Every structure is written in C-alpha cells, then in structure tokens.
Design a protein with these regions (language model features):
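A structural microfeature
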Residues: 25, 106-109
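Conserved acetyl-CoA-binding loop of GNAT-fold acetyltransferases
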Residues: 97-107
C-alpha cells in the first residue's frame, strides 16, 4: 500500500517475530535527526494477542536496540536515545514500557487529537 511505501522511503526499519511460519509480532523504528544525534523512535509494536506475556515484546525491543546500534555504528555513531509515544489511557502499554526499561519523560496535552494526551517514554544509552 501507499502507506507502507511511504514508511520505507522514510527509512523505517521492520523487525518481525515468527513462530511456526506465522508472524506473531512486529516492531518498527526510524532514526531522527542527523546520525550524530543517535536519536531513534519506536514507531509501532504489536504482538499477536494469544502470544502476549511470553517475552516476545521484550525480545523485539532488544532486537530493535541491536538493529539501531548496528545501523548507527555503520555510520560511525552510537545510539543515545530511543523514544516513543503512547496514548495516556493505554495503561497496559505504560506497564510494558516501564518493565522493559523506559522512563515516562513527559505528557503532551492534546498532542495528536483534542482531549487525547500522549505520553512520551524514553530509554537513554551511554
């Protein structure tokens, strides 16, 4: 679709989790700014509902970080900050992100939609 092609053109990176030839999870990320900034965004993560709670999300986050680290190192730089946005009322996501090492950095009021606040979660690297 056009949205997928647009994402590829913007340098989105895709990582999938596969079990018995079935995709059970997906995470996407993209770099922001110049490579020297080491800034990248977790754009999307989704796990097949019947496979949740089995470490797949954590594994995808780990692979995302390794992939981004490799990508930045290929340019002579290193990762500094991974961030994401999530709806303020998505409590399950907040619990997950905090469990895998993200910190709630701030909340953006009416960020995408009126009356829908977004939380910004970040993970910093040395």
């Amino acid at each position: 679709s056009e949205a997928f092609i647009s994402e590829i053109e913007k340098d989105f990176h895709y990582i999938v989790a596969v079990q018995n030839d079935v995709i059970i999870g997906l995470v996407t990320w993209l770099p922001h700014g110049l490579p020297k900034h080491g800034l990248f965004e977790l754009d999307r993560i989704c796990i097949l509902s019947k496979t949740r709670g089995k470490g797949i999300g954590r594994g995808l986050i780990d692979k995302l970080i390794k992939d981004a680290d490799r990508w930045y190192k290929s340019m002579g730089e290193s990762i500094r900050k991974l961030y994401l946005f999530t709806h303020e009322d998505n409590v399950d996501a907040h619990i997950f992100y905090e469990k895998v090492g993200f910190d709630h950095e701030t909340t953006l009021k009416d960020h995408y939609y009126k009356y829908q606040n977004e939380r910004v979660y970040s993970k910093f690297f040395n």
